[in-house]
């Protein structure tokens, strides 16, 4: 049972079992996101973890075969992936879940700027 101060039928009402249904007098709606949204959130978090890892470790052996400036390439690709994945899967009902991803984007852009400034100073 969950307390709902706006509910006029009593102090508490049960939670809805599943789905994004309209709020009725019988239950409280809990958003039930499908697997695509969960997987996109996980992908974004993993990408951001990779960005942090690349900031603290100088070795990225996969990318070093392709380009000498590996960290700049890696930090350019990751935000593009963030925008690509969220652009496909975001809807009006799910936009609240992506607040964490917006924060990760800001941090990603900050890391890119710091990385590029550090490389200019070298």
From Swiss-Prot:
Transmembrane domains' residue ranges:
36-56, 72-92
Q: Which keywords does this chain's UniProt record carry?
A: Membrane, Transmembrane, Transmembrane helix
The signal sequence is none
Q: Which domain of life is it from?
A: Eukaryota
- Membrane topology per record: Multi-pass membrane protein
Q: Where in the cell is it found?
A: Membrane
Q: What is this protein called?
A: Putative uncharacterized protein YFR056C
Q: Which organism is it from?
A: Saccharomyces cerevisiae (strain ATCC 204508 / S288c) (Baker's yeast)
